[in-house]
Amino acid sequence: MDDAGERMRDFWDDRAREDAFHFVDPRETFGQPDEERFWRRGAQEVDALLELLDLTLLKSDHVLELGCGLGRLTRVLAQRAQHVTAIDVSPEMLMLAQDHNDGLYNVEWVLGDGETLAGVEDASVDVVISHSVFTHIPSPKVQLGYVTEFGRVLKPGGWAAFTLSTDPGAHKAKPPAAPPAGSSRRGFLRALVGQAPTGKDQPEWVGSWVPLDALGATATQAGLFLERIEGSSTRRTLVRALRED
């Protein structure tokens, strides 16, 4: 693992300790997650992703999920597929995921290196899913490297569904500000004492975007055909890619 991978691991380990539920789904109130709603939204997001990209999971599928976090989507995928390989860069997230999903006997939890799918054999999976993960990766090069890896691990005829940002204006960190006055100052002070989220000004949260032409060129080199792209030029671009024979 290089320095970039180490930084991502350290960042997401810190966020897992701080409030894993909020950082996996920022709609959850920091420090006060509604766990039932959190898991329900995971199922809804799997359904929405598959519906928008016109995809269907088969009970015989071996699914690889990149960036599983707490296993919010993993839980649903495990119910619908034969086997799930759930990968995350953060050992803290993986530990929590296993604690919250200890009944998922068809899931293999794997610690990733933040850059590759090392350890996953060539042409060994039917489906790759990665949702709201690339958006937080600071390097477009790393994102495109993962696309190349998708082409390597997918069986011919297999498919990948993933989200990434194609909006260059969506990844600008706000500069550090002086302690504000009034109610904003109270929020600033809450962050100082651990009552508000931290780290959202760091590159590992701010993330980066990928030009569509670079995505297309990388996919072609990896043996992937980009069958469908929804939401181009936005922070939430959905991609369906087919592994060609």
Model-assigned labels for residue ranges:
Residues L144-P156:
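A short glycine-rich, Lys/Arg-flanked "PGG" loop and its adjoining helix->strand segment in the class I
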Residues G119-V128:
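A short acidic, Gly/Pro-enriched loop at the edge of an enzyme's catalytic core
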